[in-house]
Amino acid sequence: MYEVDMTIIGGGLVGASIAWGLARSGTKPLVLDGADLDLRASRANFALVWVQGKGLHAPHYALWSDASARRWPTMANTLLDDSGIDVGLQQDGAFTFALSEEELEANRQDMESIELETNGRAPQFEVLDRQQTLDRVLGIGPEVVGSIYCAADGHVNALRLFHALHAAMERQGATYRPNHPVQSIEPTTGGFILKGEAFSILSRRIVLAAGLDNKRLAPMVGLSCPLKRSKGQILVTEKTQTALPCLSAGMRQADEGGIMIGDSEETDNTRISSSPDISAVLASRALRIFPALSDLNVVRSWTGFRVKTADGVPIYDHSERYPGAFLVACHSGVTLAANHALIVAQQIAAGQLEDELSVFSARRFHAQQAV
């Protein structure tokens, strides 16, 4: 039987970020990944480094997101050194546009609640009326009544980030095995036996970073990972030399020139196919915000399933019953990548998650049920 010290189950953005961080700290993990056609959030993400509006009624999540966004410049530079790939990080701030006074007021209340709940430690924001928004953003449509602006937000090139993480983790000594889905985990003396269709591996320590499959795998090591279905859809326009004037919650322009339009959510759909109705809604809202987009053709559309926990807040756990088993689950794999690579990986390498992460344990769901 093949024996290793550390295995990460899952090679998406979360698993690769942790694998790279572990490899840099001296722990050279084996990464077992699924197939290309598996339901992967990593290949359908919007690539935002985003803190605006995150952590409503969960101040620890708001501050955790902000901390990761602040670490992203270090992450991007280190990743460039290790992989030779520039992930195109831009952190110039972003807008959330409102198409009604009610929408603007709801967004303002959410941001003020986060500010209050974090005792003013969350990133600063501005509530802008229509004229103030026009002064900063050219070309907005007549229906835009105002916006929220946060200077902490940004984005990266999604495909280059994924490529860079995989290149960097392997150059630092991680071993990557695609098409190796784990069917079962058996705790045993000296670690865990991981079994797949054509392999059996004894690993002293493991990290569950398998996205949607964490829900199935977690109970095998005495953990839980409550997830809810969340399907998102993205439209991509043809490449254009005309720059989108700003980054926003539902629109971003990749550095190659194409404009991505997203921000949908379906909770009762299991099909991977795109919905024409949702495409129409996404396109309509985008055109109401930036009418000039009508000159562009949509050339691609795809969907993905977010790894969204039952309350939307990440889960970081360490099995009490089977020490050596860790779990990480979140739907903010890009934003939190810096924390995962630079902070969480080091704690896993040391064998214990620190107290600051205890509030993210899935035990919170059991406590809620008890109440």
UniProtKB/Swiss-Prot annotation:
The keyword Lipoprotein does not apply. Its EC number is 1.-.-.-. Keywords: Oxidoreductase, Plasmid. GO terms for cellular component: cytoplasm. Pathway: Opine metabolism; octopine degradation. It holds the Pfam family DAO. GO terms for molecular function: oxidoreductase activity. InterPro entries: FAD-dep_OxRdtase, FAD/NAD-bd_sf. PANTHER family: GLYCINE OXIDASE, SARCOSINE DEHYDROGENASE-RELATED. Heterodimer of a subunit A and a subunit B. Oxidative cleavage of octopine into L-arginine and pyruvate. This is Opine oxidase subunit B. It comes from Agrobacterium tumefaciens (strain Ach5). The lineage of its organism: Bacteria, Pseudomonadati, Pseudomonadota, Alphaproteobacteria, Hyphomicrobiales. The gene is ooxB.
